[in-house]
Amino acid sequence: MPDRYVEYSQNDYDNIMKLDTLFISQLDSKYKVEYHKLPSLISGEVLKRCGYFSTMPNQLSKVDIIDVSQLESLGNNRELEEIKYSSSENYFLTPAACLHFYPMLEHKEVKECIYSSLVDVFRYENGNFTMGTRQWEFTVREFLAIGNPKFVEEFLEDLKEKFLTIALRFDSTAKIQNACDNFYPTNLNKVKQKFQKYNNLKFELIVHILEKEVSVASFNYHNNHFSKEFNFDSNDTIVTGCVGLGIDRWISLIKESEKDYKL
């Protein structure tokens, strides 16, 4: 189905590259930034340690391969009458851009730094897809801040202000608002959502696309949730926080604004 993913034109591609360059340029020289190329595949073990199977299992996409035993029956036929799949490999498509960074940091002595990557991300969204704003596959520019609480909190506040300023170029109603993750609705997860909102752990940059409110960026304070699990907080001083910018939604915003894209 075409709303699961998007093929972009040359003009769209040019705008994506300009947009990503603009996002990266918002990081002041005071930040130590490492840029990484991250894969689309992720281990189920990493997802388990991150808590994904309990919080958002409905968003996950399992990677399967065709059952090789079927191929013997292919014979001279052009194709298999019925395709069966084997799911023995414990791999999934990456559901969140920052998740690969945590095992990379395991047992490292980490000081104040930023990890960043442009990542293809996959979320099933319960099958509720909309072209340009809610797809199965989409692209995210991710910034992960690692350091003491003051460093991470100030980084998140810095980027909130800067990305809101950019969004206001295309939508005069753009705003930052308190939010929570769309966890699978168990009783425990409902408590986690309330905890997130009450403690201001998540904010979103909201714009209007096709007359609907859409988040084009999220700002997340993790505390020591990941630094403890992945053993890079040996002195109880290291926390993390991330900023994710949904490239596809930004492109939809720019198109709707009917304004020439200028860096």
What are these regions (language model features)?
Residues M1-L263:
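TRNA-recognition modules of translation machinery and tRNA-sensing kinases, especially anticodon-binding
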